Amino acid sequence: MIFRSRWNTALLFLFLTSLLMSAQEMPKAPQAQVFTLTPEPGFFTEPGVAVNPQNPQQVVAVFQDNVHAGYSQDAGHTWTVAENVDPKNFRISGDVSTAFDNQGHAFVCYIAFDQLGSFNYWAHGATRNGIFIRRSLDGGKTWEADHIPVAEQPSEPGIPFEDKPYIVADNSKSKYAGNLYVGWTRWRIADSQMVLSRSIDDGKTWSKPLEIDAHPGLPRDDNGAAEGFSGVVGPDGKLYAIWSQDDDIMFTTSSDGGQTFSHARAAIHTAPIMFAIDTLERANGFPQIAIDPKSKRLYVSWSDYRNGDLDIFLSTSDDGGKRWSEPTRVNNDPVHNGAEQFFQWLAVDPVDGSVNVLFYDRRGDPKNQKQIVALARSTDGGKTFANYAWTDNAFEAGGVFFGDYTGLAAYAGRVYGVWMEKPPGQETANEKSAEEKTDATNSGATNKEKKPKPPGTVVKVGTADFSNPSGNQALGAK
């Protein structure tokens, strides 16, 4: 009887395990392709991607260390990395974002500086720095020589540090069509400000930065500061903007082309946006905002750990942001299963209205250390989501900096994602420490011969095609 009971228990365990594994499996994204933009690992992080609405064959993907830009002229089937995009008169550049305007011109926006201030307290000891843009008139192949300043700070004591810009293009049919907006965090000694500058001449000149909101208190990443600007323009030219502050997503609008803004208010309450994840140096849940230009429905996505582990959430508004829906969980693995989903990015397809979310997903690793890249898609206005695997091979992120975000764009059923991966065979921080101890003890001759490559990241861009109605079916999220 004891043997039979144990045997039945074992069978039950195997049965439940198989059910759990099948529930965690995701179908492959339809017609998925993945390309590596950086063949050799480096400090490549924080990418972005945009599709030219005037010529959807043109796609630009940007990333840092320093500023780099890849481009495709055939809707993502082939990719090339452009040369000499980064500014040469600054030591460091990054925090890139990209957009196409209504003339089909591509823009890359970035910060540039010579040396960071104190870690997490970026305004303390800041050196000359600024926010700049650069233009491409041929879909990303070549970039104009001018690095146009949006805001600059000279090398003087007590200067602010301009950080994490995001560029938005007005591609509506309104009287503000063609406007460009850049929002960012201005770190000062005593507070953090959310500021915005606009251009009405195709990015050639920029307005004096306008303060949208300010957060008093010690301006640090881990102190609830105003950080992580995201913006979108509606079909009537209205600009909607969000960012993280304390445990809330802040929201404001401009109805006059970025000249004035409504009073910023907390629109969506979340858990803190900064959190620790096993094997990752740091992570956050910065939000993004998008709009369906046909229905005018607004969407906001973010990640937080209200369920005990990190999940991706989405909320919608049908009244211009006055009221927001209860959050919908985007990832469809079992709730409270301990698997982390993080570094999401949101894109709404302006043609078919689908809602697309890219994220890293650890549901397939019982140790919750390795992730694949997943894509969630909703065709019912964000009520439910199908989940797809964009990549097959899980990777872990130990010992490398993964930055703060990924990137996503969608147009006419084609979806473009850009992200970072750590290639296999690299040492982690713990492995490096253990190896150094062995080298010190045994002179290191054998170990040095077998020493793996130093840790680093590569940037990959993925495509998926939902325009074919016979594409794969995926499990729905509730």
Enumerate the language-model features and the residues they cover.
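Sequence-pattern detector for short linear motifs
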Residues: 7-9, 201
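Bacterial N-terminal signal peptides
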Residues: 9-19
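Extracellular, repeat-based ectodomains that mediate carbohydrate processing or recognition
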Residues: 24-478
